[in-house]
């Protein structure tokens, strides 16, 4: 139990950028994607009962970068501004499209992020 408490303490002290990097490393190590369970949960919930998941979908949206387009540098800059990621992390996200840029945001914020990405030359979807 002492080891688990130490792990919890260490994880609690991580910065947002360090947590994002840890997430990425764990995804690579375990061969999973953090974005996939969110989509699966939404689809699974919709099959269970249409009324409750429909309300949840209306309040939280994910902005997905589907294509970086020809002007990757501007898109990387915009992704950095939106997410607060470092240069390498933003570049990896853009080059790994389709990927979620921002998850669980309001409809207005999702539309704003999508517009910023499209203005930078990328293609994005709000889901």
Curated annotation (Swiss-Prot):
Recorded superkingdom: Bacteria
Q: Does the keyword tRNA processing apply?
A: no
Q: Which Gene3D superfamilies match?
A: 3.30.1390.10, Single helix bin
Q: Which UniProt keywords apply?
A: Ribonucleoprotein, Ribosomal protein
What are the boundaries of the signal sequence? Answer: none
Tell me, what is an example of a GO biological process annotation in this record? translation
Look up keyword Acyltransferase and say if it applies: no
What InterPro entries has UniProt attached to this entry? Answer: Ribosomal_bL12, Ribosomal_bL12_C, Ribosomal_bL12_C/ClpS-like, Ribosomal_bL12_oligo, Ribosomal_bL12_oligo_N_sf
What is an example of a GO molecular function annotated in this UniProt entry?
mRNA binding
Which Pfam family, an example, fits this chain? Answer: Ribosomal_L12
Query: Which is one Gene Ontology cellular component term of this protein?
Result: cytosolic large ribosomal subunit
The role this protein plays is: Forms part of the ribosomal stalk which helps the ribosome interact with GTP-bound translation factors. Is thus essential for accurate translation.
Family named by the database record: Belongs to the bacterial ribosomal protein bL12 family.
- How does it associate, per the subunit comment? Homodimer. Part of the ribosomal stalk of the 50S ribosomal subunit. Forms a multimeric L10(L12)X complex, where L10 forms an elongated spine to which 2 to 4 L12 dimers bind in a sequential fashion. Binds GTP-bound translation factors.
Q: Entry's PANTHER family? A: 39S RIBOSOMAL PROTEIN L12, LARGE RIBOSOMAL SUBUNIT PROTEIN BL12M
What is the name of this protein? Large ribosomal subunit protein bL12
């Amino acid at each position: 139990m002492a080891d688990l408490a130490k792990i919890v303490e260490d994880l609690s002290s991580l910065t947002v950028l360090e947590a994002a990097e840890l997430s990425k490393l764990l995804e690579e190590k375990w061969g999973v994607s953090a974005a996939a369970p969110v989509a699966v949960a939404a689809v699974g919930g919709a099959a269970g009962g249409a009324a409750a998941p429909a309300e949840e979908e209306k309040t939280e949206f994910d902005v997905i970068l589907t294509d970086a387009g020809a002007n990757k540098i501007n898109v990387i800059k915009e992704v950095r501004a939106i997410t607060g990621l470092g240069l390498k992390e933003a570049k990896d996200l853009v080059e790994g499209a389709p990927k979620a840029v921002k998850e669980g945001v309001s409809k207005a914020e999702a539309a704003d992020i999508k517009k910023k990405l499209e203005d930078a030359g990328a293609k994005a979807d709000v889901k």
